[in-house]
């Protein structure tokens, strides 16, 4: 399979990362979770006490980060940060850092450079509208806020993180608002993206649907 790029966008907790990961494995192409990149920046910024408004420090921080992927895990400066970037404190802060124009510009540039070298499936908030505008396959994965909150709660409890449904739902709705209303590259469905509501479908059913569409071509 040559010169293929697949863009998968959607709100927090819609299942897009899990779906994109499986598709990458099925089609034997590189999977890039762009959300992990924003989470890694958020983690490093919090560790270094860098606020979202401290633009120059954020730019210097990102430029000092050597980002790569080992399978599905994000590696920064040689360290696997996959577990650290899934902590609730990152969930609560990532949208603030991801809304910073300079942060998005630097990470989008990294993502586009990767797509020029490899066949990729990328998931995020602005893949079909910004990062891979010319991707031949674009999908917008969504689900109701309540369904997404239940999924996120299950994930967190499986990791031993104790949190209640009301707090998770509140966080999901807050992230939806920030992601959809930020000035730079807000979350929105690309006009040529196929909308898939996963509320009443299993991950396997959604993956099969997407793979069928791709293989038709």
Swiss-Prot record:
It holds the Pfam family Cytidylate_kin. ATP binds at residues 10-18. One of its GO terms (biological process) is pyrimidine nucleotide metabolic process. GO terms for molecular function: (d)CMP kinase activity; ATP binding; CMP kinase activity; dCMP kinase activity. Keywords: ATP-binding, Cytoplasm, Kinase, Nucleotide-binding, Transferase. It comes from the Bacteria. Gene3D superfamilies: P-loop containing nucleotide triphosphate hydrolases. It is an enzyme of class 2 (transferase). It is found in: Cytoplasm. GO terms for cellular component: cytosol. Its main location: cytoplasm. CDD domains: CMPK. The keyword Cytoplasm applies. It catalyses: CMP + ATP = CDP + ADP; dCMP + ATP = dCDP + ADP. InterPro entries: Cytidylate_kin (IPR003136), Cytidylate_kinase_dom (IPR011994), P-loop_NTPase (IPR027417). Its EC number is 2.7.4.25. Belongs to the cytidylate kinase family. Type 1 subfamily. PANTHER family: CYTIDYLATE KINASE, CYTIDYLATE KINASE/PANTOATE-BETA-ALANINE LIGASE. HAMAP family: Cytidyl_kinase_type1. This is Cytidylate kinase. It comes from Clostridium botulinum (strain Hall / ATCC 3502 / NCTC 13319 / Type A). The gene is cmk.
């Amino acid at each position: 399979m040559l010169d293929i790029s697949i863009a998968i966008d959607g709100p927090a907790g819609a299942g897009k990362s899990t779906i994109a990961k499986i598709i990458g494995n099925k089609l034997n192409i590189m999977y890039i979770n762009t959300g992990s990149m924003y989470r890694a920046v958020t983690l490093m910024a919090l560790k270094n006490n860098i606020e979202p408004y401290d633009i120059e420090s954020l730019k210097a921080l990102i430029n000092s980060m050597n980002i790569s992927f080992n399978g599905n895990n994000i590696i920064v400066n040689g360290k696997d940060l996959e577990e650290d970037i899934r902590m609730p404190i990152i969930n609560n802060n990532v949208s603030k850092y991801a809304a910073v124009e300079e942060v998005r510009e630097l990470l989008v540039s990294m993502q586009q450079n990767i797509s020029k070298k490899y066949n990729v499936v990328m998931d995020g908030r602005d893949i079909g509208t910004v990062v891979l505008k010319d991707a031949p396959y674009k999908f917008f994965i969504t689900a109701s806020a309540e369904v997404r909150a239940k999924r996120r709660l299950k994930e967190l409890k499986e990791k031993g993180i104790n949190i209640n449904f009301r707090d998770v739902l509140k966080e999901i709705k807050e992230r939806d608002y920030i992601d959809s209303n930020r000035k730079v590259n807000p979350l929105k469905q690309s006009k040529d993206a196929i909308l898939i509501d996963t509320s009443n479908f299993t991950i396997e059913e959604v993956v099969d649907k997407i793979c069928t569409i791709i293989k038709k071509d």
